[in-house]
């Protein structure tokens, strides 16, 4: 389970056996949601938050923090996903404790 970011306590990661579409999971205190990235002609055109089967979803401020982070770091998240799954590179974990405004 490569952890790629932590933002204000929300852990952002993917499972090592993942598949397309490109997506990441956000987890906080046992709650978990996932975000799928829809890409057309190399551009991210949409990010959809989805439920994770068997898990209670992120709620309230944690869900909002996850959404804000995804919007700001979408390109970097996709880059890390591609590096890990397509190029089998090690990826760096980054912890961010400053709120995005």
Regions found by a protein language model. Name each.
Residues 1-32:
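Short, charged/polar N-terminal "headpieces" of proteins
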Residues 9, 15, 20-22, 43-45, ...:
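Residues in flexible loops and secondary-structure boundaries
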Residues 10-12, 16, 34-36, 74-83:
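Broad hydrophobic/π-residue packing in well-ordered secondary structure
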